Swiss-Prot record:
InterPro entries recorded: Arginosuc_syn_C, Arginosuc_syn_N, Arginosuc_synth, Arginosuc_synth_CS, Arginosuc_synth_type_1_subfam, AS_cat/multimer_dom_body, Rossmann-like_a/b/a_fold
GO BP terms in the entry: argininosuccinate metabolic process; L-arginine biosynthetic process; urea cycle
UniProt superkingdom: Bacteria
Name of the coding gene: argG
UniProt pathway annotation: Amino-acid biosynthesis; L-arginine biosynthesis; L-arginine from L-ornithine and carbamoyl phosphate: step 2/3
Binding positions (L-citrulline): 91, 96, 127, 131, 182, 191, 267, 279
Keywords: Amino-acid biosynthesis, Arginine biosynthesis, ATP-binding, Cytoplasm, Ligase, Nucleotide-binding
Binding-site list for L-aspartate: 123, 127-128
Enzyme class (EC, first level): ligase
GO function terms (MF aspect): argininosuccinate synthase activity; ATP binding
Protein name: Argininosuccinate synthase
Record text on subunit structure and interactions: Homotetramer.
Amino acid sequence: MSKWKDVKKVVLAYSGGLDTSIILKWLQTELGAEVVTFTADLGQGEELEPARKKAEMLGIKEIFIEDVREEFVRDFVFPMFRANAVYEGVYLLGTSIARPLISKHLIDIAKKTGADAIAHGATGKGNDQVRFELSAYALNPDIKIIAPWRDWSFKSRTQLLEFAEQHQIPVAKDKKGEAPFSVDANLLHSSSEGKVLEDPSQEAPEYVHMRTISPETAPDKATIIKIGFEKGDAVSINGERLSPATLLAKLNDYGRDNGIGRLDLVENRFVGMKSRGVYETPGGTILLAAHRAIESITLDRGAAHLKDELMPRYAELIYYGFWFSPEREMLQAAIDHSQRHVEGEVTLKLYKGNVMVIGRESAKSLYSDKLVTFEDDQGAYDQKDAAGFIKLNALRLRTLAARDRK
């Protein structure tokens, strides 16, 4: 293609799945470019070795598979959870938060290998194309970015399958013997889209769920756990200090075994259309509940309410791909400042898809049983003071009412 005629070497974000395997071959045959593959170990597990073998089979000499799990949780997931970020009220941004990290490594590898461009397998209809490219341009304004879904002649996954067969590219099959759902997975979540899920009126088949058992089949006995926090980040489970990635993985196990973290969502994509996805975020769902609980006793009301007002904008920035933007960093600075005293321990009961907070304690707690007690507070609070407080706050309301009565 003439627009890429000067590109000699490309770093491809490679999962080993259908789209990126075909993109790899397409870059070789249509552009004549040397391809370097980068696969991020974000906690997706068995996807990694097949990706290496496919890349080797397709003649790739430079294959980068990097374990970025600790970096992912420490530098991306945990900062996001300090904000209690959810998009459109429910989505914990599991796919969104991984994209800037992948772009960061693509840019680093391009510099290391002398590549002219980077490439990704995001479609021209989705959010990921925006997330990958905004992040990449923020880190290297001169980088060339190839997005084959916007350039090639393929219009459907059926055509991709035909191309794969023509070039003897192996494609994974799901339990139905068909091409698999469009799947994204990392240590925070998994998502499934496409096929029967494109009809939002139909319940997702049980076999779509990869990370959790059904709440109906979860144990009849509740699981009790304690999560410890320091400066807004989870640092321990049941008193055992763990690294960020290890801690999230352990929460995933608790969530999986108790049917926690399933979400069937129709969301508003950045490009303007609505899409339906099935998400599983077992550990993240537990972590969010615990973090909000420890904040409830350690954050001042004004700070907590302002933080809640900022959260939708912060979540939207991540969803839209503006992780490396100045406005996200400004919000992060404010959020991180609010977390200085967010420490302590939260006790949770996990039962059949539910996360219930049953206890919270902190050396920095603002909760005072002497103030709120229904018993004798020994003069800690004079209830007569409330009368003046109420009169002052009622002044404008009484003035309005008097005017309207005329």
